[in-house]
Amino acid sequence: MKKMKLVLVGNGMAGVRAVEELIKLAPDLYDITVFGSEPHPNYNRILLSPVLAGEQTVEQIILNSWEWYAENHITLHAGKTVTEVDRVRRIVRAAAKDGSVIEAEYDRLLLCTGSNPFILPVPGKDLQGVIAYRDIADTNTMIETAKTHKHAVVIGGGLLGLEAANGLMLRGMSVTVVHVNAWLMERQLDDVAGGLLRKSLEDRGLKFLLNAQTQELVDDGNGRVKAVRFKDGTETPADLVVMAVGIRPNTALAESMRLHCHRGIVVTDSLQTVTDARIYAVGECAAHRGIAYGLVAPLFEQGKVAANHLAHLGIGRYQGSLTSTKLKVTGIDLFSAGDFMGGEGTEEIVMSDPFGGVYKKLVIKNDKLVGACLFGDTADGNWYFRLLQEGCNVRDIRGQLMFGEPHGA
């Protein structure tokens, strides 16, 4: 039987995981072609921070070696950017660095174009020394810059920004984190935990400017950044500026294909685009029920469902994901999930030990745990997340909740 043709646009974690799942379910159904704009096989983007910090090498974060593609009879076009998709003839066209064009036909198309970093629209954003932090090339630029320059400014006090700041500090740079909000990681932490995080990072040598609005990146006269100027007129020196102020789904290709996009490529519960059932979208580029996810767990869940449908099983349904954040920033453990800010109709149980560097906050509503924010001691994070996911009634264990999972539970 002649095989169908599957083309994957985007050689990242979400798309390749979907292909792995598909190969498990239907190893001989498709001839698979993969296009990736980076000149690398699939790697673990989450581990770019340890690479920046000098704790791991690029080779150590590769998830799928060149050999894996060959062993699974996958045609990989690495370093080739897809520029056009003809939906009528079902042809994908990609451009190589030398200008040559590669074409591939498809019966099914999987779009995993990911996201683009948001760049603040301020004067000086195009100066040399101003970068985002998304891939191996960005990481290598930071490592090289740290060898010859002293002052770094990271704009953005979220997870990515703090990891970039920590890595640059370990590379010997003097690092200032600039954040527009009143506390760090406001999407994952409340003000108390955010304050504890700031103090811990200051103790390690990072500097912070909070409630700071960037007005301009200042030119040194030779086309390179030399300082960041703020709305209040003050400046801080910068040989390197790293923008870590969020991401936007990369929908440019999908829009050129006239696929419906709103906060991402709009998909159904089967991860098929609402415009064209032959085309699937998975990962940061996809908008499911109005949400584009930027964390790995939901992307892998999506990949599993898409693979199920591509394998003609057709029983998987993606229902959305409850997400949690569990992370380590310079040895500091953090965990948050659900509605950890609380509010009307909720009850909060709080344990705070600022001297020991431990803070726990649990939010309860209608006898159910609806949110958790942990700092310094995250041992029970997985248990709390399970209670959240399953919507368990916690009335009978309310008194013990703060002390962790009961034995025999």
Predicted features along the sequence, with ranges:
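FAD-binding core/adjacent interface of flavoenzyme oxidoreductases
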Residues: M1-V7, N64-V153, N211, R229-E235, ...
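Mid-to-C-terminal Rossmann-like scaffold of FAD/NAD(P)H-dependent oxidoreductases
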Residues: K2-K5, K24, C285-N382
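Beta1-alpha1 glycine-rich phosphate/pyrophosphate-binding loop at the start
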Residues: K2-T75, G167-Q188
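Glycine-rich Rossmann-fold phosphate-binding loop(s) that bind the pyrophosphate
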Residues: G10-A14, R134-D135, I155-G158
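A Rossmann-like FAD-binding core segment of flavoenzymes
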Residues: D31, L76-K97, A104, L170-V267
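FAD-site-proximal beta/loop scaffold in flavoenzymes
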Residues: D126-H149, D219-R229, T234-N308
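Cysteine/selenocysteine-centered motifs that mediate thiol-based redox chemistry or coordinate metal-sulfur cofactors
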Residues: M142, V394-A409
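A short, polar/charged loop-to-alpha-helix boundary motif
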Residues: T378-D396
